[in-house]
Each structure stands twice: as structure tokens, then as C-alpha cells.
């Protein structure tokens, strides 16, 4: 009897499967989805430090939306943030119920939702440096879901600037002029606060655009308490006499050109550095331009001249050999109190800047990434407490510029005998 059942079994095996299985397979294709989620705009989306940005995200229905009985309530909207391999929830909303993560409290909103169930755009304000990353918009409606993602880049950097000869050398008027001279502008209180929220710390009082003097502290300690009673925050001296002398907090944002490292075989003096850049259809870069390039990802473990006579280099991926364990624009000072630019006859590489519309006339010289570091003694990343006379600014520290002392007797940084 067994042979009589064999054809029947084969026929059953070859017969089409249940319709439900075919529906499942078809449901996996994007063509069968009820809707698609799309983020508009050219990636990466650009925001500015301390500013606001709206990430436009819309739901496009591919067939008429289901009736009220087909689904319960409004679509579920979820925004997430991805950076450094980690994912964090920004907010989750369904109808009038919205849950916002603590890190984004009072900073995010869905301006159109739920009045519009197809516009789930995210408004993000008080932008910080660590808001740069991938944002994902996900919508779930009934059994259907769809998502889209976009990269966001928050541009703009706040940095402390001081004269090479002395600390606290700028009146309010001279502070504004100094920032403009180095290709930047004086920072606003909002920009300094946004930088602080992104992790910036500097125990040095500096002018801001509203004629106040402030400084950001992450780790309260002796001589860096200010008016915060031992708590982290931005210390504020309030409105200060414009003739008083302090450092400055400058702000740089747009590069609008190409910044490159020039590395001639024998290095160059400051005067030779200017000529070197001109020969290549460029000019010697300003400090503000170097900070903007670093903010855009420039990483060079090689000290170079800048237009103000300072010698600096940008580090994105830190190492002990390249100035310690913190990223930033490293500055070479002659003296332990973090003053004194190198002698103009010392020899270093040079950072040049070429406008966007200016073609290259001569290829840039190439050199190892660590050229010139043989003569630099790297300091530790521990923030240094440096005290000044009490009459300058009572009980305040002057520490923690990214800096390394230099030695004038050999290697890549050389002075004539």
C-alpha cells in the first residue's frame, strides 16, 4: 500500500504553500508598506553652536491611511541619536503623550505633531558640540513601521585667546579687535554656555560679547570656584569695566577655504612661512581658521606657524606623543605660565590657508605627521593650576590651555645660534 500514497505525498510537497506565507514575503518588500518615512535635506545637516535646527521628517502614505477601527490611536513617533557606536533615545510620542529624555529636556519638540500626523519633524535648540551625530526618525502605525536617518554636524568652536607676551592683556575694545584679527569673532554668552554643556572647561576669565567676563568649569577646585559655590558651571563676573584687562573667548565657525600643512625640509622662520604660503597661492593661516579646521576634523601632529606669530597644531585623536590625552588645538609656549610665543627665527612647519576660489599653484610639501615633535616636551593632560598676583583677579586660576613647552636647541623646532 505504501507505493499508492507516494504520488499523493509528492503532489502535496509540490503544491503551493498557504496564502498567508506569500503575504508575509510580500509584506517584507518596501512596495507593500503602508507608508514610508523620509528625512529631507542634504546630509550632513548643518547647525551652529548655541543655535537651533529642525530635522524635517515626513510620513508618505503609499495607500489611503487605515480607518479608525484598523489601528488604535495616533502613529507612534520615536527619535533616536547615534554617536560613537551608542544609541540614545531623544523622544517618544503618541498623540499628545510625549516622553523626552533628560539630556534633551526643554531642547526638543515636534512642532507639527500631532496636529499633522504626516509631519513628525524634530526641532532641536541650544545646539551643543556633542549634538553632532546620526538622528533617526521612526514611525509605527498599526503593524507597519518605517524609519529614516540623517547625519547632523554642529559647527562652531569657542576658544580662549591671549597675547603671547602676557596674560590678561585685553580691554573690552581690544578684545573684539583681537578676535577679528585672528579670523574669528568674540563669543556670545550663549556660545560659551553651549560649549560648556559640550564638555569645554577653561579656568581663565575672558571677555564675552555682552561685556561680561566668564569662564566654564566642569571640575570645581580651589581658585576656580568663582560664584558657583563649588558647583560646575559657567562662572560670571557680571558686567565689567571695559578698561579692565582679561583674556578673550573667541568663536570661529566657517572656514570658507582650504587649510593645509606646509612642511618644507628644513622648516621655516615666521617670515619664511609667510613667503612659503604665498608661493602656493595661499596666505599664512590665522588662529581662528585653524580652530575652524580642527572643528571640521583636521588632525595634524605637527606644530606650525600661524599669522599672529603663535605655533599650534590640531589634534582630533589624542595621544601622549601629540600633546597629551585630550583633543584640541595645542599651543606652544616658551614659559611655564603659558605665555611667550616662540622666537620668530625659530623653525617650524606652517599652516597655510587658500580661499575656496583660489587654485593651487604649487603642490604642498609632505612630511610625517609628527614632524617637529622631537623638540617638544609633552605635558600631562591634568589641568594645571597657575596663580597670578591677587590684584589682577582675586583668587582665580589661570590654567588649562592645551599647551606644550618647547626646547630651542634641536629637532624640528630650531633657533639660529
Swiss-Prot record:
GO MF assignments: hyaluronic acid binding
Major place of residence: secreted
SUPFAM superfamilies: C-type lectin-like, Immunoglobulin
Disulfide bridges in this chain: 57-137, 179-250, 203-224, 277-352, 301-322
Record carries keyword Signal: yes
GO cellular component terms, semicolon-separated: extracellular space; perineuronal net; synapse
InterPro entries xrefs: C-type_lectin-like/link_sf (IPR016186), CTDL_fold (IPR016187), Hyaluronan_bind_Proteoglycan (IPR050691), Ig-like_dom (IPR007110), Ig-like_dom_sf (IPR036179), Ig-like_fold (IPR013783), Ig/MHC_CS (IPR003006), Ig_sub (IPR003599)
GO biological process, any: skeletal system development
Location of the Ig-like V-type domain: 23-155
Residue span(s) of domain Link: 157-252, 257-354
Role noted for this protein: May play a role in the terminally differentiating and the adult nervous system during postnatal development. Could stabilize interactions between hyaluronan (HA) and brain proteoglycans.
Family annotation (PANTHER family): AGGRECAN/VERSICAN PROTEOGLYCAN (PTHR22804), BREVICAN CORE PROTEIN (PTHR22804:SF41)
Listed name of the protein: Brevican core protein
Gene coding for it: BCAN
Amino acid at each position: 500500500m505504501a507505493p499508492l500514497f507516494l504520488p499523493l505525498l509528492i503532489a502535496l510537497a509540490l503544491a503551493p504553500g498557504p496564502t498567508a506565507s506569500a503575504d508575509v514575503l510580500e509584506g517584507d518588500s518596501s512596495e507593500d508598506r503602508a507608508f514610508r518615512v523620509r528625512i529631507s535635506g542634504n546630509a550632513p545637516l548643518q547647525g551652529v553652536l548655541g543655535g537651533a535646527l529642525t530635522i524635517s521628517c515626513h510620513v508618505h502614505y503609499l495607500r489611503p491611511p487605515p480607518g479608525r477601527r484598523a489601528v488604535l490611536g495616533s502613529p507612534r513617533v520615536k527619535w533616536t541619536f547615534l554617536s560613537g557606536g551608542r544609541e540614545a533615545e531623544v523622544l517618544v510620542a503618541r498623540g499628545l503623550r510625549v516622553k523626552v529624555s533628560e539630556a534633551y529636556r526643554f531642547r526638543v519638540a515636534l512642532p507639527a505633531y500631532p496636529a499633522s500626523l504626516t509631519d513628525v519633524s524634530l526641532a532641536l535648540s541650544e545646539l551643543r558640540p556633542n549634538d553632532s551625530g546620526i538622528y533617526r526618525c521612526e514611525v509605527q502605525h498599526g503593524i507597519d513601521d518605517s524609519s529614516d536617518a540623517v547625519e547632523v554636524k554642529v559647527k562652531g568652536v569657542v576658544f580662549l585667546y591671549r597675547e603671547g607676551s602676557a596674560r590678561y592683556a585685553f580691554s573690552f575694545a581690544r578684545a573684539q579687535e583681537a578676535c577679528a584679527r585672528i579670523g574669528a569673532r568674540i563669543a556670545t554668552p550663549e556660545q560659551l554656555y553651549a560649549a560648556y554643556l559640550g564638555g569645554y572647561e577653561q579656568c581663565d576669565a575672558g571677555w564675552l560679547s555682552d561685556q561680561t567676563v566668564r569662564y566654564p568649569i566642569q571640575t570645581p577646585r580651589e581658585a576656580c570656584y568663582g560664584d558657583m559655590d563649588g558647583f560646575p558651571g559657567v562662572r560670571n563676573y557680571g558686567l565689567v569695566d571695559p578698561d579692565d584687562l582679561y583674556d578673550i573667548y573667541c568663536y570661529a565657525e566657517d572656514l570658507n577655504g582650504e587649510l593645509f600643512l606646509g612642511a618644507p625640509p628644513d622648516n621655516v622662520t615666521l617670515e619664511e612661512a609667510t613667503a612659503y604660503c604665498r608661493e602656493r597661492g595661499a596666505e599664512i593661516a590665522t588662529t581662528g581658521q585653524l580652530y575652524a579646521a580642527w572643528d571640521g576634523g583636521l588632525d595634524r601632529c605637527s606644530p606650525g606657524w600661524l599669522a599672529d606669530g603663535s605655533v599650534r597644531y590640531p589634534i582630533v585623536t589624542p595621544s601622549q606623543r601629540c600633546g597629551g590625552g585630550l583633543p584640541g588645538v595645542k599651543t606652544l609656549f616658551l614659559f611655564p605660565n603659558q605665555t611667550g610665543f616662540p622666537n620668530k627665527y625659530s623653525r617650524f612647519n606652517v599652516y597655510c590657508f587658500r580661499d575656496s576660489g583660489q587654485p593651487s599653484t604649487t603642490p604642498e610639501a609632505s612630511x610625517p605627521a609628527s614632524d617637529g615633535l622631537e623638540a617638544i616636551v609633552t605635558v600631562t593632560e591634568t589641568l594645571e593650576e597657575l596663580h597670578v598676583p591677587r590684584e589682577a583677579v582675586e583668587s582665580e586660576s589661570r590654567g588649562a590651555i592645551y599647551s606644550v613647552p618647547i626646547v630651542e636647541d634641536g629637532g624640528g623646532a630650531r633657533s639660529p645660534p
